[in-house]
């Protein structure tokens, strides 16, 4: 009997489409990131699914705004995944 799908070695495309608990190895899809302010170039650590608006400590500009899921970065801000 030959299986159509290989259950032990799924392709990365099918793993990305599945729910986070239904994958072969469970792992969260959220992460922390360093966000660089566009005005003062100060770096702030932000959670990817932040539920409140995050502002810069020194110049108090808004770095990201919450949405239903992931936080949306303001235009001009760059980020690096930790």
Swiss-Prot record:
UniProt keywords, alphabetically: Cytoplasm, Ribonucleoprotein, Ribosomal protein, Zinc
SUPFAM superfamilies linked: Zn-binding ribosomal proteins (SSF57829)
Gene Ontology terms: cellular component: cytosolic small ribosomal subunit
Superkingdom of the organism of origin: Eukaryota
Transmembrane in keyword set: no
Quaternary organization: Component of the small ribosomal subunit. Mature ribosomes consist of a small (40S) and a large (60S) subunit. The 40S subunit contains about 32 different proteins and 1 molecule of RNA (18S). The 60S subunit contains 45 different proteins and 3 molecules of RNA (25S, 5.8S and 5S).
Job of this protein: Component of the ribosome, a large ribonucleoprotein complex responsible for the synthesis of proteins in the cell. The small ribosomal subunit (SSU) binds messenger RNAs (mRNAs) and translates the encoded message by selecting cognate aminoacyl-transfer RNA (tRNA) molecules. The large subunit (LSU) contains the ribosomal catalytic site termed the peptidyl transferase center (PTC), which catalyzes the formation of peptide bonds, thereby polymerizing the amino acids delivered by tRNAs into a polypeptide chain.
Listed HAMAP family: Ribosomal_eS27
Name of this protein: Small ribosomal subunit protein eS27
Record organism: Candida albicans (strain SC5314 / ATCC MYA-2876) (Yeast)
């Amino acid at each position: 009997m030959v299986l159509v799908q290989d259950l032990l070695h799924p392709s990365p495309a099918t793993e990305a489409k599945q729910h986070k608990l239904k994958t072969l190895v469970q792992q969260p899809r959220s992460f922390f990131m360093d966000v660089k302010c566009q005005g003062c170039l100060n770096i702030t650590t932000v959670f990817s699914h932040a539920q409140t608006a995050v502002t810069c400590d020194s110049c108090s500009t808004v770095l990201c705004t919450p949405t239903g899921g992931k936080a949306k970065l303001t235009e001009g801000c760059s980020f690096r995944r930790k």
